[in-house]
Regions:
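N-terminal active-site beta-alpha-beta segment that forms phosphate/nucleotide-binding
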Residues: 1-101
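Short, structured patches in soluble enzyme cores that scaffold and shape functional sites
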Residues: 68, 78, 94, 112, ...
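Charged helix-capping and loop-helix junction motifs
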Residues: 58, 123-129
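Surface-exposed, charge/polar-rich loops and edge strands
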Residues: 2-4, 103-108, 117-120, 131-171
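Short glycine-rich anion-binding loops that position phosphate/pyrophosphate groups of nucleotides
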Residues: 46-49, 113-117
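A residue-level signal for conserved active-site and pocket-lining positions in enzyme catalytic cores
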Residues: 11, 43, 64, 109, ...
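Internal, well-ordered alpha-helical segments in soluble enzyme and binding-protein domains
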Residues: 7, 25, 128-129, 161
Length: 171
């Protein structure tokens, strides 16, 4: 593969054939120091074939947030198990709650199609998370199956690496 677009296509096809152990990925995330120390955590509502982290919502010692797209920005909205969601312009589910200040978030679990050895992630190409992470001061983590780790995701100057990539084998 020679570019991000080819890699996106490869990763989307690959993950259709991967059995994701969501419980193990959640367990491994919960064992990290970053998770244990965080109070306010931004996760994402999973798309088909994505890692599903929603079982984290059972942890009542944490406050959870889901992203909401507003123009070019990604907002952080409080979310609890059972809260109402609405469909966004991208056909993803978003909370209907009012957003909080980004500075409140201690930890963000970022969605990714795949990640490389330098902790760069390949997203869907909209740049929402890269813009969000540009001045984010908390910890950035990706959880994904180890079969979606690659040599490079062809990072560009605006791409932001995460602090930690968690797989079934932990890190």
């Amino acid at each position: 593969m020679d570019n991000k677009q080819e890699l996106r296509c490869w990763a989307k096809e690959k993950r259709k054939n991967i059995s994701i152990d969501n419980n193990l990925l959640v367990k491994n995330l919960m064992q990290t120091e970053a998770y244990r120390n965080a109070k306010n955590i931004l996760i994402f509502y999973p798309l088909k074939y994505e890692v599903n982290l929603l079982s984290l919502l059972k942890d009542k010692t944490k406050n959870f947030y889901l992203p909401k797209i507003d123009g070019e920005s990604l907002l952080c909205c409080p979310f609890c198990e059972g809260d109402e969601l609405c469909e966004s312009c991208f056909k993803t589910l978003e909370p209907i709650t009012d957003p909080c200040k980004k500075q409140m978030i201690d930890l963000v679990v970022v969605p990714a199609l795949c990640c490389d050895k330098k902790n760069y992630r390949l997203g869907y190409g909209g740049g929402f998370y890269d813009r969000f992470l540009n001045d984010f001061c908390g910890t950035k983590i990706v959880c994904l199956p180890k079969k979606l780790l690659v040599d490079t995701v062809y990072p560009e100057e605006f791409d932001i690496p995460v602090d930690l990539v968690i797989t079934e084998n932990y890190m």
